[in-house]
Amino acid sequence: NGTVKAFGRSNYGQLGQGNTATIGDNANEMGDNLAPVDLGSGRTAIAVASGIYHSVAILDNGTVKAWGSNSYGQLGQGSSANIGDGANEMGDNLAAIDLGSGRTATAVAAGYYHTVALLDNGTVKAWGQNNYGQLGQGNTTNIGDNANEMGDNLTAIDLGSGRTATAIAAGLYSTAAVLDDGTVKIWGYNAYGQLGQGTSPNNIGDNANEMG
């Protein structure tokens, strides 16, 4: 029915219930006793993802909402305030993430502390923690924790000349995309060769001229 239910640890509000109470570890907390996450009036979800302490959903209108831990801006709200751990933070009170003028999302992924969206035009945007270049911007600056970093101000990741993405994924500190020609590109943390470039520990995306 497009509703979302979450259970487990909620120390940062990642279950979206307006509190930090763990759910599912005691009797009578599941089933009909577990309220769905409030996504907003009349809204349902078509996809979900979760990081270590944050949750993300694409709604039926293509917008994206995220809640839980926000220490690195991974909720995309231009602040570092957690969402979902206090009353009246969810539902219509939670603004959709600004993906850019007229843009919607077709897929989302979440790393430890970063969030990735595949947009309707095949571009990819990422925000949150960027200590290893996992946001693909050629630097290590976090995105989404300050005003005016999202929306049209957030540059889509350079996937290469004329290239778009058809699928995305996120590791702890890395991001991957399947491109429209069937190739795969991965960037971010590379201590164990997880970027598949035959090198380590050379991270990719944390310096200029490493993407595209």
State where each predicted segment sits.
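Conserved core positions of repeat-based scaffolds
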Residues: 6, 54-57, 66, 114-117, ...
